[in-house]
Amino acid sequence: MRRFVLALLALFSLTAARADEGMWLLKLMQEQHLTDSLRKAGLQLAPEALYSENAPSLRDVVGRFGGGCTGEVVSPDGLIFTNNHCGFSFVQAMSDLKHNYLQDGFFAKSRAEELPVPGLTFTFVVRIDDVTARVEALARQKKYDQHTRQSAGVLAGLAEKLLKTSTLAKTPGVSARIVPFFGGNRYYMFFEQRYDDVRLVVNPPQQIAQFGFNQDNWLWPRHNADFAVFRIYADAQGRPARYAKTNVPLRREKWLPISLRGVEQGDYTMIMGFPGRTSRFLTASQVRLRCESINEPINLAGEAELRFMKSLMDSDKAASLKYAGEYMKLGNMVKNFGGMNASVASTRLLDIKAREEAAFREFAARSGRPEYRNIIERIDSLVAAVRDTLHDYNLLRFTYGAQDFHPNTAALSGFILRFAPRVQANWQRLDRGKKQIKAGAEEKKLYREFMTSAHRVALTTDFDYDLRKMKLLAPYWAKHHRLKAQPDFVRDDMNAYFDSLYAQTAFRDTAKINMYMATDYFEAFSEDPVISHWLLFDRLINEVYRPALDRYERKVAELNQIYVRGLCEMYGWTKAPDANSTLRMTYGSVRGYSPRDAVQ
């Protein structure tokens, strides 16, 4: 018997789903003839039950958990399910060695025991509008190129303006964001309502929730309880509100009932959520660039950093809790990038792309559209020119700049990389050799903020950890960077260099920090060894790599927009747009599979 199965999280499933290859935007169901395909696949619901802006639908029960995960409402009282790894960093931040909810788990026996989670939000999509014409009109008026019109700042400004004149302008908790689709050929504005009071209900113990840990990550079938349970709270009128004891569970008119019937071979199944990012419209050369100049250097440094962190975490319970979120985040990225490269090879994706490009060249010749001719070759030329620069840029970020990508770690190098640019940008132009740098009011304000942060860093940074990590990662840059770039970080004795750097910096001396806080001058900081080291890093990033990458991104945005438009025309606009952290749906049917010989 065929049954309709709505699968939003396959928490314990050992089955597989045979799916189509799209992450579909439900707003485009009619335009892309998706409803016919869904019915043929076995969907028994009306299309408006999936997505409707005028009546309750699945849009009302699937939301964005935190900044980018997916959750779903499974009760009329705001109970939500999500993946355990989605709540991982939030539960870590709530834990200490006495109440280690991450390692030991947590179970609220009543609503009174549910724990508020600082910083956690849950967001529902309220409406989606096509604003392509508005974006293009603004771009023509301001003479924006493709890169600029797709930039976050430009789109955020327009979204704010359009929200103010919309019917949702005064709805509590509603914001708007505009997102480019199909390589910048379409733009949609998402009206979203955010709830700020989300509380922890259930978190399985780590050994159960993360069984297999990164070895099983991105692989299926899975044998871990990768789930967590939270609840959304609102004020007495059901409006979004900050945490308050008087808040009540959010009442929802529609929710997902949980079925314990299981599934059978051939059952219809679908997934709704907020997938992060895909890049299915790339050329073969761009796929190769991603593999060789992004994934490979990041994996090289990332795997070394993971080994270093694990050795420390295995021997120290406090360190295990402190770095758990950072370790999971980095491990997830490394496994993803490594798996991506392996999949490109195993699926012979470059051969598939070559055939698609050949078909596109034939389409371009038939179309009579001059902008489509040689577009692939023009993209290939840009890629060839930037390949080594992009490789070294990523290698440098994840060796010398590794801490900057883990902001939850109060590490010295991360602090310098995040904050010092703001100070340097406001320094007056003068001879670096001067002992004192006189500053205006704005510079003095930044300096005070800088010194206050420096004092906090001096008290909280594990300098030995930071030093050991820098010594470990720096040689990877020395050995694997491709371009001869100046300034060069390679030293004859890297260990001695970093020992000297960390021994002499004022950031380790709270007395010096206090003394500097008492003055209005940037006294001596231009000569601090850590500042000097950061300035070398900054020069290499901003004077060598970023200008070349910015030129590439600006030029390739123009060409990608043309190429993706041509591909969509070739396919009759029947392809799903790339994932971009917006609400999507994919569907298929349940079936078993054999991942390797003798396993089914």
Task: Enumerate the predicted regions with their spans.
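Positively charged n-region of N-terminal signal peptides that target proteins for export
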Residues: 1-4
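Terminal presequence/propeptide segments associated with secretion/organelle targeting
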Residues: 8, 15-600
